[in-house]
């Protein structure tokens, strides 16, 4: 922009051209966009997201396969309300989802049934705003991405208490039963289905086609086949027999129920498995008539110990496929199967049915990768090859030929983004809907019915609404400041449905892993029970299509770094495992070659020093290790990690100030964060500012001739600036323009500031003059001494907005009413109320003031006939109603800045005719506007096609509307219905076709907008505001509170250096410098050494001098060195390291020792004393114990606990203690008597029995013990 350039900072980074950041909100926006695929034509949509849900559930057939309901396409209409209307009215920002359905009949008997194609309404779906949030019931919410264990196969090892190593392989599918193969202490391998049913693994192998012992042994190449003859077997004496030698015969049995003769195969075991071949049993083998037998190979031939296989065969109760299938069925169902087919069907449906079992793209990819097999990616069910490969891998693992999986490795954990979570919810909803459709199809066999009759729209919306309203991953958005917003949207949680629980999560899951490098921030995570379970994405990290987190690296070939456009590639943790990676700040020459012969690098979890030729990749930037919040801390490399964690978390709690400063010492990420947070108004393209004032910016954008021609919109864009808009955390968004009339703007220019930003940069706090020195003991234990100037000049003043709501209901006794005429209330108390009973904008509010006046009918008794008559003659009596007004709570004081009143349309019979007239008029207006739009559309289309020949224009059913070769004359064009036509390939001329496609697309969008606008107007005329049932009106009052900094407020720097304001000192009493500059803050120097957050000293003693009028960027791990600091402090003419003699403000004398002085960045946090200050005399009591409730929200008391009782006992204060335990706590009779005595001025009565004693007695009686009080 010409007049307002963004802040230019002196950058200390050694890497001057780091890689551009991707959009910080891509994790939300891209995921939702891919879920809906609205910009993709139906025929080009990928099988993912919403399209995949429809593909999986359609077509739907009835039970006799007579009728088929087919899905063709889905689309959405514009939302009924704008974002601001949804927030103020408490509504959900959603769009109507509609689908094109086709119902046809395949039964020749129903020849008269016509195929029906209809647009069916499937209910509203919450729609993501452009800033990556959802508005649900007026509140902004974020769907947090979830980290969970990836589908696939996992190998693990554990040790039994007796010292035996146990091995297991677990297959985790996307959908379906879990199966686990595990060994026990007897070296037998079992298969566990769904962690419950246990069977020898060889039984499963028989059931899936490896019927005989021979098949199973051949699978692993354990045995060799030997011909049965004395001479041949003699060579193998002493070797183990691998498979049973059986003598089989057929026996005829009579079925007792039917009397039929049934043939059954019988077996006799001649020689069992694992018996040694000796002279004694050779004869038995020959007599059995066996042609061949299986002999175990020598250990030297095998190379591996396969005893687990032979041990498992010993435990196997089955001898054939049929027996195995029966055994598995019995294990799963606890009953015998009816027939072979049903037994076989159960096994198939468990692992081999696409409907019941799904490994997903990820599961198939992981299994193929892990086992080195090459099964088609489209095969999403288990195969026999999978099962055999897993068992073979497990045997190798037992023989130490393979290693177990590290479940905390990021190749074994993936991310469920918002799109995938919505896919799961829609899957549940559509499956339910499909069930009801099938039922309705079966019932309406001979009736004429349509897709609309079959589909119930509420099924899907109820599932989706419950997800957004109750799911642990749909969270109330943290909107304290722009950083809090963007961090919340980039958060990854291991908690939630299908994830871990904080009680059972161990240390390993929470710990930092080497694969987190560049993917998950090792610093930013909550303190407390969720530590390590909730993380943040690193600045450069992306989530790939499979849900794995990847990070970018530059390729290095022969010691030379590739700085070309194609030189950067994204690597998942798995792909990076065998690569050697150099640090981002390793010194390079101008050709990109490493200067040093020995380079520090990373290889897996090791940090070797290698030669440049051994390096495969290099970090794109030193910042890539950290998240956005951590990368905003300058000199982070000098801070202890624990304090950096606190610093990252506290920046999110910084309240937006009336006047914010961008930090003098920043890191260079501040501007990108503001741009991507979408909290400011950003230019959408090149253009000129036509008008600016405090609440509106108008910009006329430049457009090409073609774009202007195909558009139906004016190129003047109007932006309304939010003024004192309330956020979820009651902070305010108040934007100011930073452009001027006549300015040229380019795409991406930031046009406003405010809401913790200054001139397009993040500005969470203020730059203040700080001295590290004790001040009369007032900064003991991290307390902060503050200059009164901070209060007087509103340096740390913030505005907070509270919303107060009152509902007007329909009661049994009649309607409630908003009014300023309230019984038994003085005129003085209602002076600020308007006719509707709502307080006027601009009124000052104090505790106890009436905000909204409401009267509600009394419910004493039914009126007598006489009273009814008097009531009818003289109107309402004050006695009929009681005051139900909303009053200001004890801690509220502020100014009313906005009021709203939402009402349902209450039409009498007389009014209904007028409403019909309004609706008719609106319909006529809409038709007129649509006709005008179509006329303009035809005019543009005729001009565009210019009598060109048609290329064969088709509709969505692929029927030709305009035949190929026909001239596109005005007469031909006017007959086309644009809503039903395919918008591509009209004339064969690429440029014309592209413009036609844009023109039709813009026309349809504009037509939908007009229809939506008039639908909304009709809704307002007929129904009024959307309110819940039983509620007639909702009144809202917004009250702004201006909060200056005061004693008890919490403040912090960016390095985890937090403290409470302990004293506000007059400016003249603060320590001052030689030139008379007084300090703004005095901090305790003892807060630095033990906390090891030296970054604050570097920030302070660095360039932080206002004398230079310059700002700095010192990126983390690549910032200013001590030499740089010295250079700039010398330039500013201030002592190195900021050591300066200060003078006492009280006496004017110089202090003995020099103090460290400089300008540092301080924030005011959301923990303010006004919100925490609380006092109670009487209030609510707990129902059972009759003790006062706890906490400010419940207007509770202070708990006088066990240790406090000891203190009073130690002092011998018996009467005070008795009071505490009785009348001040739960002596119900005593406290009312004490209150009465205080009112009357009488002496205090003797305390009675506490209620908690009665509770104890009742509990003991409940155990059957009898007591009586004497």
Swiss-Prot record:
It comes from Porphyromonas cangingivalis. One of its GO terms (molecular function) is DNA-directed RNA polymerase activity. NCBIfam families: PRK00405.1, rpoB. The RNAP catalytic core consists of 2 alpha, 1 beta, 1 beta' and 1 omega subunit. When a sigma factor is associated with the core the holoenzyme is formed, which can initiate transcription. Its EC number is 2.7.7.6. Belongs to the RNA polymerase beta chain family. Disulfide bonds: none annotated. It catalyses: RNA(n) + a ribonucleoside 5'-triphosphate = RNA(n+1) + diphosphate. One of its GO terms (cellular component) is DNA-directed RNA polymerase complex. InterPro entries: DNA-dir_RNA_pol_bsu_external_1 (IPR019462), DNA-dir_RNA_pol_su2 (IPR015712), DNA-dir_RNAP_su2_dom (IPR007120), DNA-dir_RNAP_su2_hyb_sf (IPR037033), RNA_pol_bsu_bac (IPR010243), RNA_pol_bsu_CS (IPR007121), RNA_pol_bsu_protrusion (IPR007644), RNA_pol_Rpb2_2 (IPR007642). This is DNA-directed RNA polymerase subunit beta. The keyword Transcription applies. Gene3D superfamilies: 2.40.50.100, 2.40.50.150, 3.90.1100.10, DNA-directed RNA polymerase, subunit 2, domain 6, RNA polymerase alpha subunit dimerisation domain. Pfam families: RNA_pol_Rpb2_1, RNA_pol_Rpb2_2, RNA_pol_Rpb2_3, RNA_pol_Rpb2_45, RNA_pol_Rpb2_6, RNA_pol_Rpb2_7. Keywords: DNA-directed RNA polymerase, Nucleotidyltransferase, Transcription, Transferase. The keyword Transcription applies. DNA-dependent RNA polymerase catalyzes the transcription of DNA into RNA using the four ribonucleoside triphosphates as substrates. It is an enzyme of class 2 (transferase).
């Amino acid at each position: 922009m010409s007049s307002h350039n963004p802040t230019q900072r002196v950058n200390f980074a050694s890497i001057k051209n780091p890689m551009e950041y991707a959009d910080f909100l891509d994790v939300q926006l891209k995921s939702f966009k891919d879920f809906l695929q609205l910009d993709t034509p139906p025929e080009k949509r990928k099988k993912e997201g919403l399209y995949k849900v429809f593909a999986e559930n359609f077509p739907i057939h009835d039970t006799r396969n007579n009728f088929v309901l087919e899905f063709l396409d889905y689309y959405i209409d514009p939302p009924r309300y704008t974002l601001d209307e949804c927030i103020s009215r408490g509504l959900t920002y959603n769009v109507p989802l509609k689908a094109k359905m086709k119902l046809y009949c395949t039964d020749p008997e129903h020849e008269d049934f016509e195929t029906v194609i209809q647009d069916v309404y499937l209910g509203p779906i919450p729609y993501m705003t452009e800033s990556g949030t959802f508005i649900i019931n007026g509140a902004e919410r974020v769907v947090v991405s979830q980290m969970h264990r990836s589908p696939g196969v996992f190998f693990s090892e554990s040790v039994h208490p007796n010292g035996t190593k146990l091995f297991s392989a677990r297959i985790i599918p996307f959908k379906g039963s879990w199966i686990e193969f595990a060994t026990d202490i007897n070296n037998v391998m079992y298969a566990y289905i769904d962690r419950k049913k246990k069977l020898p693994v060889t039984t499963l192998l028989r059931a899936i086609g490896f019927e005989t012992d021979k098949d199973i042994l051949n699978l692993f190449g354990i045995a060799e086949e030997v011909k049965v003859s004395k001479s041949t077997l003699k060579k193998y004496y002493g070797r183990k027999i691998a498979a049973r030698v059986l003598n089989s015969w057929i026996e005829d049995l009579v079925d007792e129920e039917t009397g039929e003769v049934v043939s059954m195969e019988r077996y006799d075991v001649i020689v069992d498995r694992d018996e040694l071949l000796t002279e004694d049993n050779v004869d038995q083998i020959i007599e059995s008539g066996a042609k061949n037998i299986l002999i175990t190979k020598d250990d030297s031939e095998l190379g591996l110990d396969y005893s687990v296989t032979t041990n498992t065969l010993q435990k196997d109760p089955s001898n054939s496929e049929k027996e195995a299938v029966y055994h598995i069925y019995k294990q799963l169902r606890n009953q015998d199967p009816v027939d072979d087919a049903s037994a076989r069907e159960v096994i198939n449906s468990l692992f081999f049915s696409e409907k019941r079992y799904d490994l997903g793209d990820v599961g198939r990819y992981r299994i193929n990768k892990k086992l080195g097999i090459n099964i088609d990616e489209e095969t999403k069910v288990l195969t026999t090859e999978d099962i055999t490969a897993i068992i073979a891998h497990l045997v190798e693992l037992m023989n130490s030929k393979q290693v177990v999986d590290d479940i905390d490795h990021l190749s074994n954990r993936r991310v469920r983004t918002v799109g995938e979570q919505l896919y799961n919810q829609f899957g549940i909803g559509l499956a339910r809907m499909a069930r009801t459709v099938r039922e309705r199809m079966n019932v309406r066999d001979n009736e004429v019915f349509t897709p609309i009759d079959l589909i119930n729209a509420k099924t899907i919306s109820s599932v989706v609404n419950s997800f957004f309203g109750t799911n642990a991953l749909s969270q109330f958005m943290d909107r304290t400041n722009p950083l809090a917003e963007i961090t919340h949207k980039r958060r990854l949680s291991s908690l939630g449905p299908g994830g871990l629980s904080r009680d059972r999560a161990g240390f390993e899951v929470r710990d930092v892993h080497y694969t987190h490098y560049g993917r998950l921030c090792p610093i930013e995570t909550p303190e407390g029970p969720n530590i390590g379970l909730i993380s943040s994405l690193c600045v450069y990290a992306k989530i790939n299509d499979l849900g794995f987190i990847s990070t970018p690296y530059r390729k290095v070939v022969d010691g030379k770094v590739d700085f070309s456009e194609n030189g950067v590639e994204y690597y998942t943790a798995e792909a990076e495992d065998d690569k050697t990676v150099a640090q981002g700040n390793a010194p390079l020459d101008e050709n990109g070659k490493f200067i040093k012969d020995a380079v520090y690098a990373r290889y897996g979890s090791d940090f070797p020093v290698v030669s440049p030729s051994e390096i495969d990749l290099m970090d794109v930037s030193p910042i890539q290790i950290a998240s956005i919040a951590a990368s905003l801390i300058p000199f982070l490399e000098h801070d202890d990690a624990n304090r950096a964690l606190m610093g990252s978390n506290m920046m999110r709690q910084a309240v937006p100030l009336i006047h914010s400063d961008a930090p003098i010492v920043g890191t260079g990420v501040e501007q990108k964060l503001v741009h991507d947070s979408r909290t400011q108004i950003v230019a959408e393209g090149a253009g000129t500012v036509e008008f600016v004032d405090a609440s509106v910016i108008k910009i006329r954008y430049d457009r090409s001739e073609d774009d202007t021609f195909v558009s139906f919109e004016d190129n003047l864009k109007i932006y309304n600036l939010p003024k004192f808009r309330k956020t979820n955390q009651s902070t305010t968004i108040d934007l100011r323009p930073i452009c001027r009339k006549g300015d040229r703007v380019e795409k991406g220019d930031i046009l406003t500031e405010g809401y913790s930003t200054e001139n397009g940069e993040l500005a969470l706090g203020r730059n203040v003059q700080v001295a590290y020195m004790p001040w009369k003991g007032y900064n003991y234990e991290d307390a902060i001494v503050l200059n009164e100037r901070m209060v007087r000049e509103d340096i740390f003043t913030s505005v907070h907005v509270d919303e107060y709501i009152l509902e007007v209901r329909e009661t049994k006794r009649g309607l409630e009413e908003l009014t300023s005429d309230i019984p038994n209330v003085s005129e003085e108390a209602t002076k600020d109320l308007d006719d509707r009973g709502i307080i006027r904008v601009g009124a000052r509010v104090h505790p106890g003031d009436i905000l909204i006046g409401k009267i509600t009918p009394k419910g004493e008794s039914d009126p007598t006939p006489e009273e009814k008559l008097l009531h009818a003659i003289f109107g309402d009596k004050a006695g009929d109603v009681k005051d139900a007004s909303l009053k200001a709570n004890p801690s509220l004081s502020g100014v009313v800045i906005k009021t709203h009143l939402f009402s349902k349309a209450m039409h009498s019979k007389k009014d209904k005719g007028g409403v019909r007239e309004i609706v008719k008029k609106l319909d006529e207006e809409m038709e007129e506007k649509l006709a005008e739009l179509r006329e303009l559309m035809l005019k543009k289309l005729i001009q565009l096609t210019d009598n060109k020949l048609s290329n064969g224009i088709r509709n969505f059913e692929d029927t030709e509307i305009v035949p190929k070769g026909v001239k596109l004359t005005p007469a031909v064009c006017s007959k086309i219905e644009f809503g039903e036509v395919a918008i591509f390939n009209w004339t064969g001329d690429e440029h014309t076709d592209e413009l036609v496609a844009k023109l039709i697309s813009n026309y349809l969008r504009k037509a939908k907008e007009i229809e939506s606008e008039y639908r909304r107007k009709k809704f307002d005329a007929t129904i009024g505001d959307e309110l819940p049932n039983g509620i007639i009106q909702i009144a809202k009052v917004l009250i702004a509170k201006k909060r200056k900094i005061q004693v008890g407020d919490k403040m912090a720097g960016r390095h985890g250096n937090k403290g409470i304001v302990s004293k506000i000192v007059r400016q003249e009493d603060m320590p001052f410098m030689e030139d008379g500059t007084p300090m703004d803050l005095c901090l305790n120097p003892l807060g630095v050494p033990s906390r090891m957050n030296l970054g604050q000293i570097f920030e302070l003693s660095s360039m932080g001098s206002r004398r230079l009028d310059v700002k700095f960027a010192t990126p983390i791990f690549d910032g200013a060195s001590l030499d740089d600091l010295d250079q700039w402090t010398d330039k500013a003419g201030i002592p190195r390291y900021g050591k300066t003699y200060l003078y006492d403000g009280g006496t004017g004398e110089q202090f003995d020792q020099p103090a460290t002085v400089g300008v540092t960045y301080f924030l005011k946090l959301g923990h303010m004393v006004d919100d925490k200050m609380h006092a109670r005399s009487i209030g609510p009591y707990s129902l059972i114990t009759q003790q006062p409730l706890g906490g400010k929200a419940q207007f509770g008391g202070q708990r006088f606990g066990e240790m406090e009782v000891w203190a009073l006992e130690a002092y011998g204060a018996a009467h005070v203690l008795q009071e505490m335990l009785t009348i001040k706590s739960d002596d119900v009779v005593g406290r009312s008597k004490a209150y009465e005595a205080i009112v009357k001025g009488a002496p205090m009565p003797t305390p009675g029995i506490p209620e908690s004693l009665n509770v104890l007695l009742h509990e003991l009686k409940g155990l059957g013990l009898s007591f009586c009080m004497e």
